[in-house]
Amino acid sequence: MNTILKVIWNAVFNLTGLDISMSARYDDWSFYLIELRANYPVIKGLLADRHLAPKEITPGETRLHIVGCEMRKVQVAGPYHEVSIQVPVEPLEEGPNGTFTHLYLPVNTEQSRWPGVDIWGFPKFIANIDIKMENNRLVCRLAAGDQLILEFKMNDKAGSWKHYKWDYYGIRKQQIVKTTMDPEGFISDEGFDESASLVLGAHPVADTLREILLTEEVVRTIIGHKVSSILKKPVRIKMSYN
């Protein structure tokens, strides 16, 4: 069914320009986010071709988020894992939500990769993603085959009921598109967590992260359990990407 949808969606979009997709329901998932200090000029250069600019937190500094996600029940795509490597960006339109774009968005199934790329314009690729508890600590490992890209660890925490709204910019068919995700669930957002750590491997993605990061020290963590959300149908921003 997923493959049939891929063929139909691409045929209609390529022939007519009509997006026949719908918003996607995420009925049950967990996420583990670490935040790190990042080099504003370097990320600004990486995003220049997208016509996006990182949000400057302090002079010369922005943030990088690495988010391990266990997607257990997702409409159409089914269960999968992903690791979002994302940065906050300046909004192209005024709005109340935090605004981000993905530098990389590896996933571990083709059923979750193609709609992310074709419909939402996300930079998804297939990778090995292992998220598990080990000695009472959460471990998220991202690899390409046997080659480590990154691994981060943190203490798991039970949170209280919270609701967020995050906007994301993607690039689809040489156009900027925006979508909104509205996670709600038991979320712990307590700021600095000295238990969290990051290790980078020997891979081109890891090399890029080394250039981006000012330090590998984690400055903030957010953990979400029993989360549900809707990933809104993308809308095209009224500016040319050419």
Identify the meaning behind each predicted range.
Residues 3, 10-15, 118-242:
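Interaction-surface and assembly-scaffold signal
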Residues 10, 39, 109-110, 203:
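Alpha-helix initiation/capping motif
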Residues 35-38, 89, 202:
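Short beta-strand-to-loop capping motifs
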Residues 69-150:
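Aromatic- and glycine-enriched beta-alpha-beta binding-site module
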